[in-house]
């Protein structure tokens, strides 16, 4: 049910991913090419601390197992918030996406302005590809729920919300596992002594495997009629969900 539910929601989360990546790059380029903006927003001491110590040390300051658990919990909460808060017309979801864009874009811009763009990507890409994809899937699902409240179509609003909410629950459960994988990569691969190309390759392979899972197995399941909804006998009297 998870790959089918994520595949059916691709028309929401894929645009979310593309827009957010564009915003991150725009913020990063703007910050990286306008040092005076950085100096006006962030004290020079804080910039130096981030560039020389904090950004790199963040990934190795704690035992890997503890760090993986911490990262997994934090990312799961962010993803769950992005998804669940969609019920408030998607507005909190949009806010969480903006905060995420600012965090990534500004950090990248600051490191780029100080000649460490390579280090930024070397430490972000191994785990960040899968992690951000999971966040975008959660956010897209949340926005879909929010739009269902705004425009339920021919269904009653409560029925429409229930019909979209049940597959969203399957997405949420599946993302717990996805974020566990990204957390393990962040704790054990990102700070490892492996060459940069090897660490990024590992992250890319995992990301490609996830996308193949969604657009391969998920697509076939959706075409076979799987919606990500719970079994019919568990739906009470809710109307069936038609596959897109």
Where are these regions (language model features)?
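Membrane-interface capping segments at transmembrane-helix boundaries
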Residues: 214-227
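Alpha-helical transmembrane segments and their helix-start/interface "positive-inside/aromatic belt" motifs
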Residues: 4-22
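Short, highly charged, low-complexity non-transmembrane loops/tails of multi-pass membrane proteins
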Residues: 224-244
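Individual transmembrane alpha-helix segments
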Residues: 63-92
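Interfacial/capping segments of alpha-helical transmembrane domains
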Residues: 28-54, 98-99
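Extracellular/periplasmic helix-loop-helix junctions in multi-pass membrane proteins
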Residues: 183-201
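Cytosolic juxtamembrane amphipathic/interface segments immediately preceding
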Residues: 1-10, 58, 62, 66, ...
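Membrane-interface segments at loop-to-transmembrane junctions
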Residues: 122-126, 157-169
